């Protein structure tokens, strides 16, 4: 999966189209990501040991990875990702627009 935890992404379709947010977690088996402040759903909960009072909780729900696009930290634009190998053999992500390495080296 091209998107990692901590990346800044742009939502490209759906009800939150145009919003930017940081990736909280990645679910590679489901090909989904959870983005901070995007796709907020209300969940009705009952009282339990953790929460003595039940109620309605707002939390971010997962988005399919095809609905988000990575924002390059160098050119600050949404971009597709290319992969390349460095001289030491490491595989890194590269911005297709500015050709800079995206991975935190």
From Swiss-Prot:
HAMAP family: Ribosomal_uL24_B. Disulfide bonds: none annotated. Signal peptide: none annotated. SMART domains: KOW (SM00739). One of two assembly initiator proteins, it binds directly to the 5'-end of the 23S rRNA, where it nucleates assembly of the 50S subunit. One of the proteins that surrounds the polypeptide exit tunnel on the outside of the subunit. One of its GO terms (molecular function) is structural constituent of ribosome. Gene3D superfamilies: 2.30.30.30. One of its GO terms (cellular component) is ribosome. One of its GO terms (biological process) is translation. Part of the 50S ribosomal subunit. InterPro entries: KOW, Rib_uL2_dom2, Ribosomal_uL24, Ribosomal_uL24_CS, Ribosomal_uL24_KOW, Translation_prot_SH3-like_sf. The keyword Nucleotide-binding does not apply. Belongs to the universal ribosomal protein uL24 family. This is Large ribosomal subunit protein uL24. Keywords: Ribonucleoprotein, Ribosomal protein, RNA-binding, rRNA-binding.
